[in-house]
Amino acid sequence: MLKKENIIVLLSGGMDSAVLLWLSKTIFKDVYTISYSYGQKHSIELEYAKELSKIAGVKEHFIVEVPHLKQLKGSALTDENLEIPSENYPDEPPITTVPMRNLIFLSIAASFADVYEIENIGIGIHSLDSPYPDCRAEFASSAEAVINASSVMVAKKKNRIKIFTPFLGMSKTDIAKLGRELGVPFEKTYSCYKGTVPPCGECATCRQREEALRETFSDTTT
């Protein structure tokens, strides 16, 4: 297959975005990654994002500071006065929601896409993320429309920017199984919202990751 288009992948350092990165390598010509430091308690994930970008051999890895998200109160990911919950995600936006986070992240990635003339932005949102308003299909399609309406590259009639969301209809286990097929080094990923080393194993993110990997590698002895 002749790879023509490029992509910039939102890379947190976690399992889902790592699989997205490895998948993107099979589809796109040049792959860029972008990660964000926004006052998250689990900022250690950025070290994993750096390592994953190096292993994947990306064209360039950008790390962007988004300090104002730390000023927002009410999210357990950034507010030191709130505990990271251990229960599974509820049917409504959980306390780990950072308002407008993915919209902000996509907008910043779109700025890089405009400058570097990158036609695709990859984000690893999936079905288990549905309680988060900015992890749904309607969000992705709306964000794509706004980005294209704002793009200098599009205004110059060079290319449109597409939001690449291949995991929307997939479960965490589906993503892990795809990652296994692609040879993703899961041991180089980090998915604990508490930011501890080793991971706490108690928060919803840790437990969902563990369950997905257990189901994926149930036929092995390791």
Swiss-Prot record:
Binds 1 zinc ion per subunit. The keyword Nucleotide-binding applies. This is 7-cyano-7-deazaguanine synthase. Keywords: ATP-binding, Ligase, Metal-binding, Nucleotide-binding, Queuosine biosynthesis, Zinc. Belongs to the QueC family. It comes from the Bacteria. The gene is queC. It catalyses: 7-carboxy-7-deazaguanine + NH4(+) + ATP = 7-cyano-7-deazaguanine + ADP + phosphate + H2O + H(+). Catalyzes the ATP-dependent conversion of 7-carboxy-7-deazaguanine (CDG) to 7-cyano-7-deazaguanine (preQ(0)). ATP binds at L11, S12, G13, G14, M15, D16, S17, A18, V19, L20, L21. InterPro entries: QueC, Rossmann-like_a/b/a_fold. Its cofactor is Zn(2+). Pathway: Purine metabolism; 7-cyano-7-deazaguanine biosynthesis. GO terms for biological process: queuosine biosynthetic process.
